[in-house]
Amino acid sequence: ARLAAALSEASRAPLAIARASTQVAELAARIAEMSKPELAGDAIAAVLLAEASSRAAARLVEINLAQRPEDPRLAVVDELVERAGTARDAALTSRKPP
């Protein structure tokens, strides 16, 4: 019981990181879409890094909660990873290299 509680608590920080990273990915994708072609590369790089961060943090949550498949945070991280991936796809298709 103590281990389960510790793992549950250990999921808090990576969940917060996944949330923040997904928000960064979505914002950077919008910036990439609106920016001048010569400046879009930085925003696209930000999307890719943020998506990777979201995915890595989500995986930590999944590992920590592996013994609690009913935990609603697992669905939350699935959604966050999906959103970050959508942002990545949007950024990569919105701009072609100049």
Where are these regions (language model features)?
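N-terminal glycine-/lysine-enriched basic segments
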Residues: 1-68, 72-98
